[in-house]
């Protein structure tokens, strides 16, 4: 048997790989090849030139396979060669030349068989199949690895691959949940996954999703009458005001699915605005009662015998709603056609020299 001479190692393609720093042993590749691979079988060729060429090719494959990171995978996250790529797709796939020689990954057929086993192990641990399929895949890996032999007739190299793939499959199957189920060490088995969606539209209203906690003030609509006699009718979640003419005006919903849409301050302002009288005459016009009083005076005096005071002031006054600072003093009296007696006279001092104002409520 002739002594094997060292062949020049072909440098890896620098434009397609990224070279990480890997730990190297002091033992040469030729010595590792001799004790790890050639020990199990005799060389297939007996000529010095043939063995030299074969050993050189094996050293090149051992130096190249998965010893460097794939540049396409690092830059773009994908590689067109997928599992057939000679370079590592991630740090977990990085290998050293010594590991390739010890596992027999020095020929094209051995590397192809290893790639098939690796792909089957990854597919088995993907979690898309049931636990029984993982067991079947593991058995298939063991059977295939046992019956597979390399081009040089090495059975030990296939056994190295078999034992290595068994550890990979066992670790992957324990880490990845199967069929939506997960087994945690020291705990019970979690059956299935949570299917409840807390943000489903028919469980929580849209407004409630923006509250970290429920508001302190929780109000519900109720029937009441404002100062103008319009009754607020509650129908469902909306407030409806029915005025004297029978027209109904629906306001925005005060409460939406159990959560108040408006705050307490906005609701107070809203009720205050709606409480103003909408059926009174326009501004700068005399009230209906004063118009009736003026008519009775022009037709023959006060038929009811009630004194009408400050009629001139009354003509210039306005029938305003609560909160209107007109600055005029207005006093109401019973008209000749009305059989009702005036109820109350309210006086209010005006600020900043505006004079006295009157808030007058008329009973119909």
Swiss-Prot record:
UniProt-listed PROSITE patterns: ZF_C3H1
UniProt motif (MKT1-binding motif) ranges: 194-199
Stretches annotated zinc finger (C3H1-type): 64-92
One Pfam family per UniProt: zf-CCCH
Compartment(s): Cytoplasm
InterPro entries given in the database record: Znf_CCCH (IPR000571), Znf_CCCH_sf (IPR036855)
Keyword terms: Cytoplasm, Metal-binding, Phosphoprotein, RNA-binding, Stress response, Translation regulation, Zinc, Zinc-finger
Keyword Zinc-finger: yes
Notes concerning its domains: The zinc finger domain binds AU-rich regions in the 3'-UTR of mRNAs.
Function: RNA-binding protein involved in regulation of mRNA stability. Binds AU-rich regions in the 3'-UTR of mRNAs and promotes their stabilization by recruiting a MKT1-containing complex. Stabilizes chaperone mRNAs during stress that causes an accumulation of misfolded or unfolded proteins in the cytoplasm.
Protein name per its UniProtKB record: RNA-binding protein ZC3H11
Organism encoding this protein: Trypanosoma brucei brucei (strain 927/4 GUTat10.1)
